[in-house]
């Protein structure tokens, strides 16, 4: 069923605190299976203030007499329409086989999945076509592409680096995690050519072009060390930098492991996560800048020396940010949007109990010049709709829409759906479009919804964890100029520059 809604947001009323015991018993909040999720809460035994609040939020959403959207029911603003949807192909069509990140090149979209990746032909966005899929287990399998190469992140401890590997504890020295490299010249037959092991694996990676066109670098983000893990020892205050010769990718290797937090990051215990590495880094090569979302900290980096990134400024929000997850620059490089993945992506945080400032985006202006640049907080943005207790919902991956004269972003919110919002005025962001699919289940929490939602060459593409690939068309006067912008290749964490007024 499709519901087109010109009305205001759905609203759910709150319920008494006492509902926790009745509604949850000893049930734990569901979380994605990726390593390092900061909150996995048993609501019956919750004592930490943040854990209790997440449980309260679940109870609040569950106690409403407003049914919200039905299972798979669609609601949207009038200016955003779904024009195509392809389900996950077998064997990726199981509940535990989660779709992850997206990359683009020419007429192709590359969709990561915890069990491998899929290549789609999107020459006709209204009729995308599956070209090939590679079965290669190892979550999250975030993808990036450059020329004839595809890079895949493995942050799931494996028995070896092959695509036939099995799960094996990181406490075993011989276990493997890191980067896999594929030759994708033949899109119908990708070929695995190289692996590079990295400390603590590769939760995500960021492709950073070298100033010489002979190489690319991968900034590898990983976290959650343990004294029991031989290849992931504390304090792990670093990133790994992999250098890839484009003409001989089999020579790819780790060339540096710079410490991002040599004096230690956020110690935790203050409402935020303990910093033991970065979750995600967005590079803006045109500006020689990067922004790191690093668990309990946000950082602005100078990457003019690609093998020696330097922290220019570091920020922390112990009031509203639980887990610094990802970052997006505006096109002029004067703002950064950081996201807070409160609840690790597995909790229902889009409700009145949690409120509008947590599990949200934080917009920072970049002020000053050179090494005197600083990040100055301006405002928060969170979707205004309330989701139910079986809908994991929090800020997640998005991209700029390449609009002239404005700062507009499209973003995934898991089961909160897709939001298009304008942060041209960084102190007063506003939503201008949305699209949402109803819960995967109305009886239990199933990790679902859009993982990554990006704008590419005139259309919005969304990798839905359970449902597959969605394509949407945004028709709004504020974004009309974006239809004229074409990128030959797009890895969203490698932010491209486009002409602006």
Q: Can you describe what each PLM-predicted range is?
A:
Residues 2-35:
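Secretory targeting and sorting signals
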Residues 19-20, 35-501:
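Feature marking well-ordered beta-strand scaffolds used for ligand recognition
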């Amino acid at each position: 069923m499709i519901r087109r809604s010109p009305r205001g947001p759905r609203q759910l009323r709150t319920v008494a605190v006492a509902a926790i015991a009745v509604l949850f018993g000893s049930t734990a909040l569901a979380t994605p299976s990726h390593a390092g999720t900061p909150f996995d809460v048993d609501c019956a035994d919750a004592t930490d203030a943040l854990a209790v609040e997440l449980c309260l939020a679940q109870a609040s959403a569950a106690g409403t007499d407003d049914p919200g959207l039905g299972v798979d029911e669609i609601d949207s603003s009038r200016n955003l329409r779904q024009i195509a949807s392809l389900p996950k192909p077998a064997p990726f069509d199981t509940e535990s086989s989660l779709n992850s990140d997206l990359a683009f090149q020419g007429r192709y979209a590359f969709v990561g999945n915890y069990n491998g990746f899929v290549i789609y032909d999107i020459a006709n966005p209204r009729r995308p076509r599956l070209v090939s899929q590679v079965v290669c287990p190892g979550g999250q399998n975030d993808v990036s592409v450059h020329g004839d190469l595809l890079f895949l992140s493995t942050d799931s401890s494996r028995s070896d680096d092959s695509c036939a590997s099995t799960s094996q504890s990181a406490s075993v020295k011989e276990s493997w995690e890191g980067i896999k490299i594929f030759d994708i010249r033949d899109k119908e037959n990708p070929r695995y050519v190289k692996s590079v092991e990295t400390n603590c694996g590769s939760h995500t990676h960021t492709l950073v072009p070298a100033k010489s066109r002979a190489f690319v670098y991968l900034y590898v983000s990983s976290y959650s060390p343990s004294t029991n893990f031989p290849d992931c020892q504390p304090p792990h205050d670093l990133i790994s930098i992999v250098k890839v010769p484009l003409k001989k990718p089999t020579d790819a290797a780790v060339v540096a492991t710079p410490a991002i937090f040599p004096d230690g990051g956020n110690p935790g215990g203050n409402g935020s996560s303990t910093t033991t590495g970065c979750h995600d880094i967005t590079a803006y090569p045109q500006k020689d800048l990067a922004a790191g979302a690093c668990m309990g900290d946000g950082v602005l980096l100078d990457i003019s020396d690609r093998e020696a990134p330097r922290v220019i400024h570091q920020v922390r929000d112990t009031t509203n940010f639980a887990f610094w997850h990802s970052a997006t620059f505006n096109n002029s490089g004067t703002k950064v949007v950081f996201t807070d993945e409160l609840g690790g992506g597995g909790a229902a945080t889009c409700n009145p109990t949690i409120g509008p400032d947590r599990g949200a985006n934080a917009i920072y202006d970049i002020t000053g010049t050179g090494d005197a640049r600083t990040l100055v907080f301006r405002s928060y943005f969170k979707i205004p709709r309330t989701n139910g207790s079986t809908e994991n919902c929090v800020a997640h991956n998005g991209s700029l829409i390449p609009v002239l004269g404005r700062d507009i972003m499209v973003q995934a919110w898991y089961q909160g759906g897709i939001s298009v919002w304008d942060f041209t005025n960084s102190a007063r962001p506003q939503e201008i479009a949305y699209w949402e699919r109803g819960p995967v289940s109305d009886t239990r929490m199933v990790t679902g919804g859009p993982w990554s939602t990006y704008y590419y060459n005139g259309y919005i593409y969304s990798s839905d964890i359970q449902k597959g690939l969605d394509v949407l068309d945004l028709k709004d006067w504020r974004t009309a100029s974006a239809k004229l912008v074409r990128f030959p290749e797009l890895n969203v964490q490698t932010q491209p520059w486009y002409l602006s007024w």
